[in-house]
Amino acid sequence: MNEAVIDPILETAVNTGDMFCSQTIPNRCLKDTILIEVQPECADTLQCVLDDKVSRHQPLLLRNHKKLELPSEKSVTRGGFYMQQLELLVKSAPPNEYALLLIQCKDTALADEDNFFVANGVIDAGYRGVISALLYYRPGVTVILPGHLTIYLFPVKLRQSRLLPKNVLKHLDPIFKSIQVQPLSNSPSNYEKPVIPEFADISTVQQGQPLHRDSAEYHIDVPLTYKHIINPKRQEDAGYDICVPYNLYLKRNEFIKIVLPIIRDWDLQHPSINAYIFGRSSKSRSGIIVCPTAWPAGEHCKFYVYNLTGDDIRIKTGDRLAQVLLIDHNTQIHLKHNVLSNIAFPYAIRGKCGIPGVQWYFTKTLDLIATPSERGTRGFGSTDKETNDVDFLLKH
């Protein structure tokens, strides 16, 4: 069972004002241990506990115990939703071989949970700032009752793979054909277009130059102008960034499927790896939602994107749109490991999870005892601040 540890030495150091050093924590406590610091003001708004509905390997659960009035002065419009960034008043420091998934946790008995959603988030081991969640909710929502907003901090054990991507550009000569298909039955209700493009080479589409066409699909030649689709990562980063190899155009409220010309190769050294694609925090905050999904071995990199910015946009060639996490197959997350998902805000059912056997270590001095990191407190798109990769083509 996961064990929540509060070291009495840490409490004494904080209460007396004594200097504290990392040597206070024995080395044996640092392996498979996630440091957590709960801010004092958290008690006023959130309950922060280990989930007692899980018998072993418990995730950290955060739940509002006060009514949340909406929309607040911090809310902004995102397509047909409001969006608000919520500080969860918690800091974390996992080992480099772990990451935390931030996931909404639902109890099926609470019907109003279908009116507000939490964007899936990935917390890197190197992030030392206060963790925030992105809350999306429908315009008719004016209040979230106590206990109705529940969020998991869900640890996952990362794996390394020296054979992560197999670039197939040379096999495509170097043109890759996209396929447009009829929208799925569970596409968003406000979906306007008759087809879902996998590539968005809008100029080619508008010129009407399909190579093959029948009642269901047609193919378009898309020239690739950028070859570095998968970026390398720092040791403390959770995922490998996925870049778009062409200018990607999305109309407001458009819901598209993207297929990239790169295959996840089988890794004979580490066959017990599951790969999952998640969005990046900077894009989720701006309203560009990457639907979290699995990336099965032997298949092209595929995922859905939902434009909730409220504008027509262009994502530039080479922009980091998503990220892929390589997760130990023994970690059972809220996504199926072999299914392409088109759900914008997937959630976990409370009590049904399979996280690795980690120890939560609660402290009031995380900044003093945590391993130094390159990223520090910079979060929510800090690595994108020097670039403007998204053009808003039409203002409303």
From Swiss-Prot:
Cofactor list: Mg(2+)
GO molecular function, one term: dUTP diphosphatase activity
Pfam families: dUTPase
Cysteine disulfide partners in this protein: none
InterPro entries tied to this protein: dUTPase-like (IPR029054), dUTPase-like_sf (IPR036157), HSV_DUT (IPR034745)
Enzyme class: hydrolase
Binding site for substrate: 280-282, 380-381
EC number of this enzyme: 3.6.1.23
Keywords: Hydrolase, Magnesium, Metal-binding, Nucleotide metabolism
Biological-process GO terms, alphabetical: dUTP metabolic process
Coiled-coil features, chain-numbered ranges: none
Catalytic function, reaction form: dUTP + H2O = dUMP + diphosphate + H(+)
Similarity-based family: Belongs to the dUTPase family.
Purpose: Involved in nucleotide metabolism: produces dUMP, the immediate precursor of thymidine nucleotides and decreases the intracellular concentration of dUTP to avoid uracil incorporation into viral DNA.
HAMAP family assigned: HSV_DUT (MF_04031)
Name this protein carries in UniProt: Deoxyuridine 5'-triphosphate nucleotidohydrolase
Species name: Varicella-zoster virus (strain Dumas) (HHV-3)
Record lineage: Viruses, Duplodnaviria, Heunggongvirae, Peploviricota, Herviviricetes
Gene this chain is encoded by: DUT
